[in-house]
Swiss-Prot record:
Signal peptide: none annotated. One of the essential components for the initiation of protein synthesis. Stabilizes the binding of IF-2 and IF-3 on the 30S subunit to which N-formylmethionyl-tRNA(fMet) subsequently binds. Helps modulate mRNA selection, yielding the 30S pre-initiation complex (PIC). Upon addition of the 50S ribosomal subunit IF-1, IF-2 and IF-3 are released leaving the mature 70S translation initiation complex. It is found in: Cytoplasm. PANTHER family: TRANSLATION INITIATION FACTOR IF-1, CHLOROPLASTIC. Gene3D superfamilies: Nucleic acid-binding proteins. GO terms for molecular function: ribosome binding; rRNA binding; translation initiation factor activity. This is Translation initiation factor IF-1. Keywords: Cytoplasm, Initiation factor, Protein biosynthesis, RNA-binding, rRNA-binding. Belongs to the IF-1 family. The gene is infA. Its main location: cytoplasm. GO terms for cellular component: cytosol. PROSITE patterns: S1_IF1_TYPE.
Length: 72
């Protein structure tokens, strides 16, 4: 069975939680918890509350996600 593709949406960081987790408000109004992707962590990209980010979510659990891009 083929793996379903991830859902990508834009959002804004609302607050920083512990262990590099963030609360993100998506454009549609939902709030999810998200962690930083490995490449962003590897390149020391810092994320602060108020930053606009792109979040990748699994179609199986829409309450969690992974931050894959920070807009400038």
């Amino acid at each position: 069975m083929a793996k379903q593709s991830a859902i990508e949406q834009d959002g804004v960081i609302v607050e920083a939680l512990s262990n590099a987790m963030f609360r993100v408000e998506l454009e549609n109004g939902h709030e999810i918890t998200a962690h930083i992707s490995g490449k962003m962590r590897m390149h020391y990209i810092k994320i602060l509350p108020g930053d606009k980010v792109r979040v990748e979510m699994s179609p199986y659990d829409l309450s969690k996600g992974r931050i894959v891009f920070r807009y400038k």
